[in-house]
Amino acid sequence: MSDSERTVDIQVVPPYAAYVDSALIEQAVECTLQMEQVAGPVEVGILITDDAGLQRLNQAYRGVDAPTDVLSFAEADDDSAFVRPPDAPRYLGDIAISWERVVAQAAEYGHSRERELAFLVVHGMLHLLGYDHERSPADEADMRAREEEILRALGLSREE
């Protein structure tokens, strides 16, 4: 397996399958990995679901009984009970995104659904890579700047 191999396992609940651009999701993942200089083969899981699905996950894992736009579940290397083969891709974790939030937030912020979807994928990826906007105002500013740099590289900046 080469360093350039990336596995993005995308699951879309049926009502949204016709609207979700899986190629854009893969591009956003790859661009984030490249710009963050993540080497080697990696694997990421992405679920596109609805507000109810995100609310269930938010309640189960964060104790917040409300829907949200994106949740990230980073894989901690030391928590695994299994030994990975040396050539296996590094599993970064999973990202869950509400398509209903993609649509609503795109309208609210006055940009395309594509930009909003890419933003949420990039946001989730940065969380999987250790960024945390809730740690401090400086960390939030750093993460926001990085998100915009990656979106600009994708041709989806706020100015475009």
From Swiss-Prot:
The keyword Aminoacyl-tRNA synthetase is assigned to this record: no
Alphabetized Gene3D superfamilies for the sequence: Metalloproteases ('zincins'), catalytic domain
Q: Which GO terms describe its molecular function?
A: metalloendopeptidase activity; RNA endonuclease activity; zinc ion binding
Q: What is its main location?
A: cytoplasm
Superkingdom as given in the UniProt entry: Bacteria
What are the annotated GO cellular component locations? cytoplasm
Output the GO biological process annotations, alphabetical, semicolon-separated: rRNA processing
Enumerate the subcellular locations listed in this protein's record, separating them with semicolons: Cytoplasm
Extract the InterPro entries matched here. Answer: MetalPrtase_cat_dom_sf_prd (IPR023091), YbeY (IPR002036), YbeY_CS (IPR020549)
Q: Which UniProt keywords apply?
A: Cytoplasm, Endonuclease, Hydrolase, Metal-binding, Nuclease, Ribosome biogenesis, rRNA processing, Zinc
Could you say which residues bind Zn(2+) here? Answer: 123, 127, 133
Which EC number applies?
3.1.-.-
Cofactor notes: Binds 1 zinc ion.
Name its co-factor(s): Zn(2+)
Keyword GTP-binding listed? The answer is no
Family under the similarity heading: Belongs to the endoribonuclease YbeY family.
Q: Please give the function described in this protein's UniProt entry.
A: Single strand-specific metallo-endoribonuclease involved in late-stage 70S ribosome quality control and in maturation of the 3' terminus of the 16S rRNA.
Q: What is this protein called?
A: Endoribonuclease YbeY
Origin organism lineage: Bacteria, Bacillati, Chloroflexota, Chloroflexia, Chloroflexales
